[in-house]
């Protein structure tokens, strides 16, 4: 099988993430895409708790059989290091072809990650292209993934929510309801 591991903090997950996952599944002919929610990312501090981000991601992908959500990082103590996640994924899926998918902005700093230079040993690296982050300058070989630009970011969603503005059509409806119910990002 060909499995995509889509890593991110998903704080919150939004339609741009889902579009990227769908594009990756189609372009890379993936049998499934696992969303790997970063529990404790070492390079940034999430706003929402890890379990809330996990639950929102579950809600976002619930109706798409191509997508599942993994607890690989949530159930492991300590910081969420990508190399540890990919090692564990390789152990769980020894016969499968793995693809690690994340934004091009993250890859520019990949060599500062714990054992970042070893990531290609465990999975093919796939970078979702973003304006301002040229992939030809990536420090490791990556497969570029071009996704229609939607101009949605988790940062902008959090800002809108803090200002009391709507995020309808930015996140799946179930995620919007969850955010409202739990008073996140206010």
Curated annotation (Swiss-Prot):
The keyword ATP-binding applies. Belongs to the NadD family. Disulfide bonds: none annotated. Catalyzes the reversible adenylation of nicotinate mononucleotide (NaMN) to nicotinic acid adenine dinucleotide (NaAD). NCBIfam families: cyt_tran_rel, nicotinate (nicotinamide) nucleotide adenylyltransferase, PRK00071.1-3. It is an enzyme of class 2 (transferase). Pathway: Cofactor biosynthesis; NAD(+) biosynthesis; deamido-NAD(+) from nicotinate D-ribonucleotide: step 1/1. GO terms for molecular function: ATP binding; nicotinate-nucleotide adenylyltransferase activity. The keyword Oxidoreductase does not apply. Gene3D superfamilies: HUPs (3.40.50.620). Its EC number is 2.7.7.18. GO terms for biological process: NAD biosynthetic process. HAMAP family: NaMN_adenylyltr. This is Probable nicotinate-nucleotide adenylyltransferase. The gene is nadD. Keywords: ATP-binding, NAD, Nucleotide-binding, Nucleotidyltransferase, Pyridine nucleotide biosynthesis, Transferase. InterPro entries: Cyt_trans-like, NadD/NMNAT, Rossmann-like_a/b/a_fold. It comes from Thermus thermophilus (strain ATCC 27634 / DSM 579 / HB8).
């Amino acid at each position: 099988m060909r499995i995509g591991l889509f890593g991110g903090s998903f704080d919150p997950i939004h339609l741009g993430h889902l579009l990227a996952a769908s594009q990756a599944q189609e372009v890379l002919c993936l049998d499934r895409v696992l969303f790997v929610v970063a529990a404790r990312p070492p390079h940034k501090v999430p706003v929402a708790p890890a379990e809330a981000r996990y639950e929102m991601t579950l809600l976002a992908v619930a109706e798409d059989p191509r997508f599942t959500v993994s607890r690989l990082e949530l159930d492991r103590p300590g910081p969420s290091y990508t190399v540890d996640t990919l090692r564990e994924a390789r152990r769980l899926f020894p016969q499968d072809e793995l693809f690690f998918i994340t934004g091009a902005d993250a890859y520019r700093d990949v060599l500062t990650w714990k054992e970042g230079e070893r990531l290609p040993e465990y999975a093919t690296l796939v970078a979702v292209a973003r304006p301002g982050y040229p992939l030809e300058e990536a420090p490791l070989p990556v497969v570029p993934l071009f996704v229609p630009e939607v101009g949605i970011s988790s940062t902008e969603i959090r800002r809108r929510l803090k200002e009391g503005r709507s995020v309808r059509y930015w996140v799946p409806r179930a995620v919007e309801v969850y955010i409202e119910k739990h008073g996140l990002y206010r």
